[in-house]
């Protein structure tokens, strides 16, 4: 997720209720000791059985790539010849901007930023993350609806956090939604750690390292280029929604029933409460209409 400061250069271009022991295979099924003896570490990390075109992950990758191509065509065909910046194009394509949400009630900007990217490198890193993580999560959930909800809800929660804590910039990108998928991963591995063999634990540590590096990237490169609040919000949203998906199976058996209910209702409260609090806070603040200055033509 990037902020408006990146655009000074115009040329810058769930698990559902059916998740019982039979469905709870995902990584463990692909890498159990019986099946993993003849496979290399790479083959266990990228099993061929989960990578195919009939998945939402593949569709999401195609949609994100297609929208970025449309952005480039629109920029070089209309925006640049008429003196409009790349940031103006991103704003018109639905990037998140607080005054548009607070003063003009454009709440679609809580969803559309997930589909918009700043640069090819920005898009490539997110597509690579979906290829590395999304297919696994989708395979484990075995439910298109839960997977799509996990992806979208995480992205929305991330955008709410961005508005709440980084309200002077615009932002966009699927990073928050992807960190939500990582949140599912974290909970899954915690609940299944004692069932994993050595290779499985090595892979899980690799995934955790990627998640950690994704989070600290916002700090290391500075808040002017990466919206760390959206990353953290997406991760928290993914964890909360994953708690809800896991509630009727693993959480119920791993924890005291009262603790499981507390986590379950706390997760619901977080997913419902954060958007409400965010909307109240940004509407109580006097926020200038910065959106009026984003698309001023240099030829004017």
Indicate where each model-derived feature is located:
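Perimembrane helix-loop junctions in membrane proteins
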Residues: 71, 75-82, 192-196, 249, ...
């Amino acid at each position: 997720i990037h902020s408006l400061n990146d655009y000074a250069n115009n040329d810058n271009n769930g698990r559902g209720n059916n998740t019982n022991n039979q469905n709870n295979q995902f990584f463990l099924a692909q890498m159990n000791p019986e099946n993993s003896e003849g496979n290399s570490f790479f083959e266990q990390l990228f099993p061929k059985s989960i990578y195919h075109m009939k998945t939402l992950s593949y569709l999401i990758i195609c949609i994100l790539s297609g929208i970025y191509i449309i952005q480039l065509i629109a920029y070089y065909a209309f925006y640049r010849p008429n003196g409009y910046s790349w940031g103006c194009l991103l704003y018109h394509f639905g990037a998140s901007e607080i005054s548009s949400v607070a003063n003009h009630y454009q709440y679609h900007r809580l969803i559309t930023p997930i589909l918009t990217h700043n640069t090819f490198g920005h898009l490539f890193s997110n597509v690579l993350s979906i290829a590395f993580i999304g297919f696994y999560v989708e395979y484990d959930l075995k439910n298109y609806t839960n997977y799509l909800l996990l992806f979208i809800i995480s992205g929305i929660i991330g955008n709410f956090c961005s508005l709440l804590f980084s309200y002077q910039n615009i932002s966009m990108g699927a990073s928050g939604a992807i960190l939500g998928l990582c949140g599912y991963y974290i909970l899954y591995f915690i609940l299944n750690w004692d069932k994993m063999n050595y290779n499985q634990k090595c892979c899980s540590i690799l995934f955790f390292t990627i998640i950690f590096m994704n989070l600290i990237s916002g700090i290391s490169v500075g808040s002017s280029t990466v919206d760390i609040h959206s990353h953290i919000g997406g991760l928290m949203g993914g964890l909360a929604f994953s708690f809800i998906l896991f509630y009727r199976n693993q959480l119920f058996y791993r924890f005291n029933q009262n603790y499981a209910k507390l986590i379950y209702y706390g997760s619901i409260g977080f997913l419902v409460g954060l958007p409400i609090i965010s909307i109240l806070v940004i509407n109580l603040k006097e926020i200038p209409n910065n959106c009026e200055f984003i698309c001023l033509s240099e030829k004017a």
